[in-house]
Swiss-Prot record:
This is TLC domain-containing protein 4. The gene is tlcd4. InterPro entries: TLC-dom, TLCD. It is found in: Membrane. PROSITE patterns: TLC. The keyword Glycoprotein does not apply. Residues 44-246 form the TLC domain. The keyword Cytoplasm does not apply. GO terms for cellular component: membrane. The chain crosses the membrane at residues 6-26, 53-73, 86-106, 117-133, 172-192, 213-233. Keywords: Membrane, Transmembrane, Transmembrane helix. The lineage of its organism: Eukaryota, Metazoa, Chordata, Craniata, Vertebrata. Belongs to the TLCD4 family.
Length: 259
């Protein structure tokens, strides 16, 4: 195992432990002390609250790193398949640590937090990012996929609004819903044509051939699975926002899976 791979797995471990600490100690103690709403929640809802705090923290850290790499990492942008992947690997390692934490959390509290779509999402990400960590390949495309995390804080915020009892017809909820739909569309849906045009542009190149069949299959299969899920979630978000906008002021729209 070379030094860069060893460092990557150290970051994965540190990331997992850090997010576990945030979930198990920092979040529950903080909100138990300062939030009366949190104290009144059931154990299952408190777990989901803490989980969404972890999710938002991960999204902000990794999303910011992605934007920095996209703007300033010339080596990765110049060679999307074999460019120097160090900072991308660090960002991916943080994400992998978070995914381990989240999968274990889902397994532990499956009856409360049941979400098979999220399990499929996490496994597809693991499948492809394993090659990034171990071989340092496809850094540009790995970073491009991680930008989608920028939509996560808005999704979580909608859940928090629901839990604290904010009416879905209130302006804070409507503005967050609009921002969520727009950001989700921009970072997960609108980029699909551009992303695949760049993918197809690499086909047949020397760099693509050097990858070998394993990374090639992992790259394409995981991308297709993730984009199917993203389109499905975008439909749910758009439908939910439409129902809220069309509902009467005192109406209570039904919840949907995108919640």
């Amino acid at each position: 195992m070379d030094d860069s791979v060893f460092i990557s797995y150290c970051v994965v471990t540190g990331s997992f432990l850090g997010f576990q600490l945030l979930f198990s100690i920092i979040s529950p103690r903080t909100f138990t002390k300062y939030s009366s709403t949190y104290r009144q929640l059931s154990f299952g809802k408190q777990c989901e609250w803490d989980s969404r705090c972890v999710s938002t923290t991960h999204a902000l850290v990794v999303g910011s790193g992605c934007l920095y790499i996209l703007a300033y990492d010339e080596a990765v942008n110049a060679d999307p398949i074999w460019g120097d992947p160090f900072w991308v690997k660090m960002n991916v390692a943080i994400t992998c640590g978070y995914l381990v934490h989240d999968l274990l959390l889902l397994a532990r509290f499956w009856k409360v937090m049941r979400d098979p779509y999220m399990v499929c999402h996490h496994l597809a990400v693991f499948y492809s990012y394993g090659y990034v960590l171990n071989r340092g390949v496809l850094p540009y495309f790995a970073n491009f996929r991680l930008i989608s995390e920028l939509s996560t804080p808005f999704v979580n915020q909608r859940w928090f609004f629901d839990v604290i009892g904010k009416p879905r017809s209130s302006w804070p909820v409507l503005l967050n819903g609009l921002a969520m739909a727009l950001v989700f569309f921009i970072v997960r849906i609108a980029v699909i044509p551009s992303y695949y045009s760049q993918v197809f542009a690499t086909f047949g190149t020397e760099g693509y051939i050097r990858l070998g069949i394993g990374p090639q299959v992992a790259w394409i299969v995981s991308c297709v699975v993730l984009d199917i899920l993203n389109v499905f979630w975008m439909y749910k978000i758009a439908r939910g926002f439409y129902k809220v906008v069309k509902a009467k002021p005192d109406g209570k729209p039904r919840r949907n899976h995108a919640d």
